[in-house]
Amino acid sequence: MASIAVCPGSFDPVTYGHLDIIKRGAHIFEQVYVCVLNNSSKKPLFSVEERCELLREVTKDIPNITVETSQGLLIDYAKRKNAKAILRGLRAVSDFEYEMQGTSVNRVLDESIETFFMMTNNQYSFLSSSIVKEVARYNGSVSEFVPPEVELALQQKFRQG
């Protein structure tokens, strides 16, 4: 049986921190489904379709990555994909506290799917999509935080607004 993982997130936008976790997950698992989700507590800058397209562009050279979106519960998506793992990135203790809640719920819903926490590399420990959007909104350079395709998309988005 293939080792399949789901790497979920809102990815609004995808950052080098996200890519760090995705790429490292791709070295561990035979197949990684990157699942773009809507976070109901956030107002996204990019549509789900735009986020999927950006992710596909920046992961196109990784053959065992598939980018999709899903509505509903993450655990149901993982079951549909026959995934045995959910891959989550952590930057700090505060991330762990937040992620533990979701993991605990997922364990109640289906205890056969494990959650793997991966610490991001230190150079990305401060990085978040919110910070990237804030810097880009005020015309700051985000080239150290996101791939060039994402930087261009941010510039275009804020020029429109």
UniProtKB/Swiss-Prot annotation:
The record marks 18 as: Transition state stabilizer. SUPFAM superfamilies: Nucleotidylyl transferase. Its main location: cytoplasm. One of its GO terms (biological process) is coenzyme A biosynthetic process. Pathway: Cofactor biosynthesis; coenzyme A biosynthesis; CoA from (R)-pantothenate: step 4/5. Its EC number is 2.7.7.3. The keyword ATP-binding applies. Keywords: ATP-binding, Coenzyme A biosynthesis, Cytoplasm, Magnesium, Nucleotide-binding, Nucleotidyltransferase, Transferase. Coiled coil: none annotated. CDD domains: PPAT. It catalyses: (R)-4'-phosphopantetheine + ATP + H(+) = 3'-dephospho-CoA + diphosphate. Gene3D superfamilies: HUPs. GO terms for molecular function: ATP binding; pantetheine-phosphate adenylyltransferase activity. Reversibly transfers an adenylyl group from ATP to 4'-phosphopantetheine, yielding dephospho-CoA (dPCoA) and pyrophosphate. Homohexamer. Belongs to the bacterial CoaD family. This is Phosphopantetheine adenylyltransferase. It comes from Bacillus subtilis (strain 168). The gene is coaD.
